[in-house]
Curated annotation (Swiss-Prot):
The lineage of its organism: Eukaryota, Viridiplantae, Streptophyta, Embryophyta, Tracheophyta. One of its GO terms (cellular component) is plasma membrane. LRR repeats lie at residues 108-136, 137-163, 165-185, 186-211, 213-232, 233-255, 257-279, 281-304, 306-330, 331-354, 355-378, 379-402, 403-426, 427-450, 452-475, 477-502, 503-522, 523-546, 547-570, 571-593, 595-615, 616-639, 641-662, 663-686, 752-776, 777-799, 801-824, 826-849. InterPro entries: Leu-rich_rpt (IPR001611), Leu-rich_rpt_typical-subtyp (IPR003591), LRR_dom_sf (IPR032675), LRR_N_plant-typ (IPR013210), RLP_Defense_Trigger (IPR051502). Residues 1-28 form the signal peptide. Residues 29-895 are extracellular. This is Receptor-like protein 9b. The chain crosses the membrane at residues 896-916.
Length: 940
């Protein structure tokens, strides 16, 4: 039987079907997460890709022939409903154009977020709308151009983006005063980050930014008044750290009642800690550290700040003290407490009232006695404990405890006993342990092997001895950095196979190690190895060529033999130091290191000639005190080498003019060789400090630890989160040795950047001293002593305005000492002894401090320095006329002297021999004396 449906029922059914179809479409939309992007925006993205030279990595954007959905492309975010592009992440572009064309963003009219951080364009332009580019992006709320290197020229473009709520300018080259006028139209700003720029001066009235909730001005050069900040009544987070603010903290800050984060650390605020902080009822993060505060600080100021979670206080003045309040029970419960340089003698009692501390930093105080192990017992969630630079003397640990502590720093205390045997059992989760600069003794406890997660271990500068425990070598499989230097460890380094598959940095210098065992061979991850100043014997293992070292230090050991050729073929080297051993054989023909690498092969027994290509990629080349021979090669061009040290070999020939092409040289040492000929006049082309292209600093180890646990102790809402993370890197020191001011000094780090010197002493150089050397205005040390240089001291030496040491002793120089040399204000050493100089010694300036030892051996000099009067006018006139007569007469006189001496010597011997030919009593006495001497010698 057929059922009949009314028209109304049919209409309802059709409507239900339609609804179901719509629901299916919505369901399909939800399944895909978005609808396809519009074609105009897709083409706009492809134009961006072409203009920005974007490769497939790190951008997964297809080519023009692929009609894929751009909403699915990486770094592109679309609205789920409209399919319009609302977010672009254009960070880390490898080869961007010099200028960014802002008109390329016109197609993205709904854009809300634009991230151009680490983009590294030099500036912006728009040929269509000029500065009004961002005016077209009416929905743009977040703009991030951090770490770009742009300057203030981009600010007029940004000022038209009136819809902006978040603006991040961190890490650029902006300068001048606070950019209030340049950003006057950004009235909707809620977060402004100006950190890590070069802004200066006071803070203006910021009432125009009435919506601002987060302001980061850190790491600039702001100074003067900061009262303009008091207008920001809605401000919740304020970071003024690392600036140059001075004086008292403004009292008007107590009106910022909504502040949750206040960081004024690393400034020059002085006086007592501002009492206004007691009124900041909403504050959760309060950092007052690294200022010049002094006097007593009472915890009563913060006792009622019930929301406080992080409190940091320290002072560079060393005049800040914490007032003792034993009965104080604050309302806050801290997660982080830092009280550095507060002259604490005991752990403050209020800490006992805290229930869940994660970070305790009491470093740089005066804590004494036993390590406060009760902190481990009371706070099971404690993750960071910093007690370095105190005076603790005894390390005791709880017996039955398995703690979650991850960072412990006890360096620079007065511990002088053995480590607790259970240290590894108590701290099995430790990741960063620093026990350096103490007096710990005996061998390492085997329980170190329980530290499965440890990544950084510093045991340097103690009195540990013995060999490394096998349980330690096998158990600490996560170790990244191991520092054992300045102890008494002995035996072979890693005598057996280890489990250090992640070890990158091994620093074990200044111990008693005697050999390199095969256990080291398996640590292929090593990038830094320092075994200098030990007693290593034998040869460098051939398998060393399999490592990709960046830094290798084997100096001052007993190693010998030739060097493995594979050692010099790695492009990763930055420093290779094999000095102070007994290596022999020829030098390698090349050194394939990284740009600006340092090569030390000095104080060995290398022989043969110097390869001309050895200098190619080096910043410092030290070949001093070997057995190298031949001539100085015609080095290949190197515009960056700063120091060339060839002293103490047997090099012969002339000084090649090719050295004048090493324009960046700061220190050139060719002393103690057998070089002949004249000094090249073109040496004035060498920099010696006149062209400072770059400076050399301590190398930060380029190895970081990717740690999942960043030790986040407080998460900020608006400004960039600050997280606690230890420094796993450290600084590598390098040095260059050079003789100056009558002593041999080692120039390290920054001191090298201020040293410029030329040493050609103890050779066989002749001829005049080139007047062109007077062009080396920034040179600080000049040594031409112990040669056969003749002629006059150049008058141009008066131009050496930075000179500190001039040594011209033991030459054949004649004539007067130029009086203008008395204008050299920095000169400490001026030695011209044992020459043929004449005339008066300058008596003004630095010459008034010189004694007679600097002028001895010059019979015709006079002056107060040698207590010889110059009042005899006839003598003075004679000396002056003699000086003007030229070199020829002086040369003839010297020849007559030498010929006369030789003739006298020859005539004396001939007379003696003729005398013996005649029979006489004297002849018989002489031969009797000779016979008696021979008999006596035979008896002996």
């Amino acid at each position: 039987m057929l059922m009949m449906f009314s028209p109304a029922f049919v209409m309802v059914m059709d409507l239900m079907v339609l609804v179901m179809m719509i629901m299916m479409m919505v369901s399909s939309l939800d399944a895909h997460g978005h609808i396809s992007c519009i074609e105009s925006e897709r083409k706009g993205l492809l134009e961006l890709k072409a203009y920005l030279n974007i490769s497939e990595y790190p951008y997964d954007w297809p080519n023009d022939t692929n009609n894929s959905d751009c909403c699915k492309w990486e770094r592109v975010k679309c609205d789920l409903t409209s399919g319009r592009v609302i977010g672009l992440l254009l960070t880390d572009t490898y080869y961007p154009p010099p200028l960014l064309n802002l008109s390329l963003f016109y197609p993205f009219g709904e854009l809300q977020t634009l991230n151009l951080s680490n983009f590294w364009c030099q500036g912006w332009f728009d040929h269509i709308h000029g500065y009004k580019s961002f005016e077209r992006l009416k929905n743009l709320e977040i703009l991030d151009i951090s770490e770009n290197g742009v300057n203030n020229t981009v600010l007029p473009f940004i000022n038209t983006a009136s819809s902006l709520k978040t603006l991040i300018l961190h890490g650029n080259n902006m300068e001048g005063t606070f950019p209030m006028k340049e950003l006057i139209n950004l009235r909707n700003l809620e977060l402004l980050d100006l950190s890590k720029n070069q802004f200066v001066g006071p803070v203006p009235d910021l009432a125009n930014f009435h919506n601002l909730q987060g302001l980061d001005m850190s790491d600039n050069k702001f100074s003067g008044s900061n009262k303009g900040l008091c207008q920001l009544k809605n401000l919740r987070e304020l970071d003024l750290s690392q600036n140059k603010f001075t004086g008292q903290f403004p009292q008007c800050f107590d009106s910022l009642t909504q502040l949750q984060v206040l960081d004024i650390s690393s400034n020059n605020f002085n006086g007592t800690v501002p009492s206004l902080i007691r009124n900041l009822d909403s504050v959760e993060y309060l950092a007052l550290s690294d200022n010049e505060f002094k006097g007593f600080f009472s915890l009563e100021l913060i006792a009622n700040l019930s929301k406080l979670k992080v409190f940091k206080l320290s002072s560079r003045s060393n005049l800040l003290r914490l007032k003792k309040l034993s009965s104080l029970q604050p309302k806050f419960q801290l997660s982080v407490i830092e009280l550095q340089n507060c002259n604490l003698e005991n752990v403050p009692s209020f800490i006992q009232h805290q229930k869940d501390l994660h970070v305790i930093n009491l470093s740089n105080n005066k804590l004494t006695g036993v390590f406060p192990y009760w902190l481990l017992e009371k706070y099971p969630n404690l993750r960071v404990l910093l007690l370095q630079n105190n005076s603790l003397t005894m390390l005791e640990l709880p017996r039955l405890l398995n703690h979650t502590l991850q960072i412990l720093d006890l360096s620079a205390n007065n511990f002088d006993q053995r480590l607790p045997e259970n240290i590894g059992k108590v701290l099995p989760n430790i990741r960063h342990l620093n026990l350096s600069n103490n007096g710990f003794q005996w061998i390492l406890p085997s329980s170190f092997g329980e530290m499965k997660d440890i990544k950084f271990l510093d045991l340097s500068h103690n009195n540990f001895s013995g060999s490394l425990p096998m349980k330690f070598l096998i158990g600490c499989s996560s170790l990244h950095t191991l520092k054992l230097s300045y102890n008494k460890f002995f035996g072979q380094i890693f005598p057996k196979q280890t489990n250090f598959g992640s070890l990158v940095v091994l620093i074990a210098n200044n111990n008693l190690f005697t050999g390199i065992a095969d256990g080291l061979r398996n640590v292929q991850s090593l990038g830094v190895l320092d075994l200098s100043n030990n007693y290593l014997q034998g040869v460098i293992p051939s398998w060393f060529g399999g490592f990709f070292f960046a830094y290798l230090f084997l100096s001052n050991n007993l190693l010998e033999g030739t060097l493995p050729s594979t050692l010099f073929s790695k492009p990763t080297f930055k420093i290779l130091d094999l000095s102070g051993n007994k290596f022999s054989g020829n030098l390698p023909s090349h050194f394939t290191g990284m740009d600006m690498s340092l090569l030390y092969l000095n104080d060995n027994e290398f022989s043969g000639t110097i390869p001309s290509t050895l200098i190619k990629d080096v910043l410092v080349l030290d070949l001093r005190n070997n057995k190298l021979s031949g001539t100085i090669p015609h080095f290949v061009k190197n515009e960056f080498i700063l120091s060339l040290l060839l002293r103490g070999n047997t090099l012969t020939g002339h000084i090649p003019t090719d050295l004048c092409g090493l324009r960046s040289i700061r220190i050139l040492d060719l002393a103690n060789n057998r070089l002949k000929g004249s000094i090249p006049t073109c040496l004035n082309n060498v920099s010696f400090g006149r062209r400072l292209n770059y400076e050399v600093n301590g190398d930060k180890l380029p190895f970081e630890i990717n740690d999942d646990e960043e030790f986040a102790v407080y998460s900020r809402l608006l400004v960039l989160p600050r997280q606690y993370s230890p420094d796993y890197t450290g600084v590598l020191m390098f040095n260059v040795e050079f003789a100056s001011k009558s002593r041999y000094d080692s120039y390290t780090q920054e001191s090298f950047n201020f040293m410029f010197g030329l040493d050609l002493s103890s050779n066989e150089l002749s001829g005049d001293i080139p007047k062109e050397l007077g062009d080396l205005q920034r040179i600080r040390a000049l040594n031409l002593s112990h040669n056969s240089l003749s002629g006059l001291i150049p008058q141009s030496f008066s131009n050496l305005t930075d000179i500190e040491s001039i040594d011209l002793s033991f030459n054949l120089l004649r004539g007067p000492i130029p009086q203008d040399l008395s204008k050299l204000d920095y000169m400490v050493v001026f030695n011209v002894s044992y020459n043929n100089l004449s005339g008066s010694i300058p008596s003004h300036g630095k010459f008034s401090t010189l004694d007679e030892t600097n002028f001895i051996g010059n019979l015709l000099l006079c002056g107060s320095a040698i207590n010889r009067s110059c009042d005899d006018n006839s003598t003075t006139e004679f000396l002056e006329s003699d000086d003007q007569s030229g070199d020829e007469e002086t040369t003839i006189d010297m020849e007559i002297f030498y010929w006369s001496l030789a003739a006298t010597y020859g005539v004396t011997w001939i007379t003696f021999i003729v005398f013996l030919c005649f029979d006489s009593p004297w002849r018989r006495v002489w031969f009797h004396f000779v016979d008696a001497f021979i008999s006596l010698f035979k008896c002996v």
